[in-house]
């Protein structure tokens, strides 16, 4: 008789263990994170040299971004 009780307890334990193992783990979405902003100090230190790729004038050491490159002169031919 105690064999049946032990077998029933083990079956319930195995069923519960399967439920725990099969539950999904919630993932943290990376889309919700905001990118870190550079402080004015690091913006000044990390200015790009002439010829480096850029997106706007504030990224270049010469403050001239032309055709996605840091430029030395305003009108580039």
Swiss-Prot record:
Q: Where in the cell is it found?
A: Secreted
Q: Which biological process terms from the Gene Ontology are attached to this UniProt entry?
A: defense response to bacterium
Could you tell me which cysteines form disulfide bridges? 54-65, 60-70
Keywords noted in UniProt: Antibiotic, Antimicrobial, Cleavage on pair of basic residues, Disulfide bond, Secreted, Signal
Propeptide part(s) removed at maturation, as residue ranges: 23-37
Q: Give yes or no: UniProt keyword Signal.
A: yes
Name by which UniProt lists this protein: Liver-expressed antimicrobial peptide 2
What is the species of this protein? Homo sapiens (Human)
Please name the gene that encodes this protein.
LEAP2
């Amino acid at each position: 008789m105690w064999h049946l009780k032990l077998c029933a307890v083990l079956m319930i334990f195995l069923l519960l263990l399967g439920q725990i193992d099969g539950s999904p783990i919630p993932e943290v979405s990376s889309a919700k994170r905001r990118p870190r902003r550079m402080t004015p100090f690091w913006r000044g230190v990390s200015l790009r040299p002439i010829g480096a790729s850029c997106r706007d004038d504030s990224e270049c050491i010469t403050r001239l971004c032309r055709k996605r490159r840091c430029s030395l002169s305003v009108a580039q031919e």
